C-alpha cells in the first residue's frame, strides 16, 4: 500500500472556476427565470446564500462539493434545454408546465438532487433523438 505522500495529488480546480461556475449558474437561473428561493433549493443552499450568489457576492467552490456539483448540473440542464428548444421562453414554459413523463413540473422536481438528475437525464434522452 502506498504511503499518503506517494499518492498523486487530486487535480486542482482552476483558480477562476468558482467565479466562472457562479456566473454561469446566475445566468442560467436568470434566463430561465428561476426564483432565488427555488435556486436555493436546487443548489441545496440557504435562501440568503442564493441571494448573495445572485448578487455576485458569493461564489460556488469545489470545496463545497454538493452545491458545486448541483451548480454544474443546473448549467448542463440549461445548455441541454438551449440546444433542444433554442429559446429561453420555450425553456421557461417547459420547466413550469406539467410533464407526463416526469410526473410533475420539471422545476418542482429539480428542487431535489435526485430530481435535478432525473430532469437532466430526461432532457438528454430527448436530445439524443435529434
Regions found by a protein language model. Name each.
Residues 1-130:
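Non-transmembrane "mature" sequence context
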